[in-house]
Each structure stands twice: as C-alpha cells, then as structure tokens.
C-alpha cells in the first residue's frame, strides 16, 4: 500500500491510498516531467539551430530550454549560464549526474562571444565545482569555422581532458546550417579539407588521452567522417 499526499495549487490537500504489487507502476502521470515550468535559455548563440528553424511550425519547436534537470532526466545539454548556486549545490548534494555541458569553447572571452552572454565565460567555473565534487559530466563542442576551431579547439580539448575522469567524454560536432539564416551571425560550412584537419586533431588527442587515462575521451561525430570521406573507426 502506498499513501500519497497531494497539495493542490489552491492549498487543498488530498490523501490517497494506492494498493499495488511491489514492482507494479503506481499509474501516476505528471503533466510534464519536471512538475513545474521549464527553464529557458538566456543565451543568443551564434550557431543556435532553433533560430534557423523554418517559420509557421508548432510553437513548442521554438522553445529554447536550458534546464539542468532535463540534463539529468533526459540527457539534454546545458550551457550552465542560468544555473544558480543553489542549483549547483542541489546537483552536488543529490548526485544528479551525469550533467551534459554545452561547452563550445574553454576560452572565456570566446565563449561569451559565441553564446552572446557576458556571463558565459564565468559559468565555466561550474565545471570545476562539479569536478571537485565528483559529479560525472559529458561535454559537447559545436564547431564553427574560423571561430572555435584550430588552436581554440585544441585548447578546449586539452583543458577539458584535465577534468578526467569526471568529464567522461567530449563530443565535437560541426555547426548545422539551414537556409533560414537571415540576420544571423555569418557562418560558413566546413569543407572536406577542414574535416580532415579536425579529424587529425581529434585522433591525436584520442591517442594522448588513451595513453594517459585509458580512454579516448574526445569523439568526432559521424558528419566529420562523411565530409572527409574517411571510414568510420572500428
């Protein structure tokens, strides 16, 4: 028997008794997975795919979430820019891991530029707090040609690898570009040669990380291999 106390928005309380077997689902369905409002994104990223959506589609497709609870529950990636100290402490206290982090750049000034948020560089400090608390994380970099590639990508991989083993993985994906980019930051698609250079750098760091930590750590998305016309790794 499960005794359930429900408090409604008007203050009225219901006490329910549910009889069920130990492994049986109680049959409780919430309106949404968080039981309150989703936290929206505070950024204006230069590569945001939602800004590139076609018009006149359903409203929910245009909502930009940036909610650490969805990271834990559904695997969403978060930028950490709207995460308050109490949110960080809650994650640490209750071990709400893994936290999937949209990093994009470990250069604080560059991250501020890419996310169009003056607090984006400072938010990187939360990665260290999670690392020191033993909270597992996964990182992601959306690579933009001429912005966070080359030396900046190498810096990001190197500095994030310092957070092993709690930064468990780092994925590198090319920016997705659509025809709906009027008025947005000018970005160019990667070429075949660009993709080969990205893969060369990632493979180099995979070797370094494997020799030092026993894990390849950084992974290239399928698009890089397709664009470079190289075979997928075994």
Where do the model's predicted regions map?
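Positively charged, polyanion-binding regions of nucleic-acid-associated proteins
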Residues: 173
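Conserved PDZ fold ligand-binding element
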Residues: 1
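Well-ordered beta-strand positions in beta-sheet-rich domains
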Residues: 15-17
């Amino acid at each position: 028997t499960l005794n359930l106390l429900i408090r409604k928005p008007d203050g009225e309380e219901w006490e329910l008794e549910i009889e069920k077997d130990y492994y049986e689902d109680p049959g409780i369905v919430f309106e949404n997975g968080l039981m309150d409002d989703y936290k929206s994104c505070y950024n204006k990223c230069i590569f945001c795919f939602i800004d590139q959506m076609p018009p006149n589609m359903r409203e929910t497709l245009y909502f930009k979430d940036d909610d650490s609870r969805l990271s834990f529950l559904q695997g969403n990636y978060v930028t950490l820019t709207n995460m308050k100290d109490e949110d960080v402490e809650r994650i640490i206290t209750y071990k709400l891991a893994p936290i999937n982090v949209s990093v994009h750049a470990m250069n604080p000034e560059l991250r501020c530029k890419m996310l169009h948020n003056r607090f984006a560089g400072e938010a990187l400090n939360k990665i260290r707090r999670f690392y020191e608390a033993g909270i597992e994380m996964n990182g992601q970099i959306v690579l933009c040609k001429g912005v966070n590639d080359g030396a900046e990508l190498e810096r990001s991989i190197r500095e994030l690898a310092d957070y092993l083993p709690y930064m468990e993985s780092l994925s590198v994906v090319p920016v997705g570009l659509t025809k709906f980019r009027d008025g947005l930051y000018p970005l160019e698609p990667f070429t075949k040669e660009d993709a080969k250079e990205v893969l060369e750098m990632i493979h180099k760091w995979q070797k370094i990380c494997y020799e030092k930590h026993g894990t390849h750590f950084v992974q290239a998305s399928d698009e890089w291999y397709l664009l470079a016309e190289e075979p997928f790794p075994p």
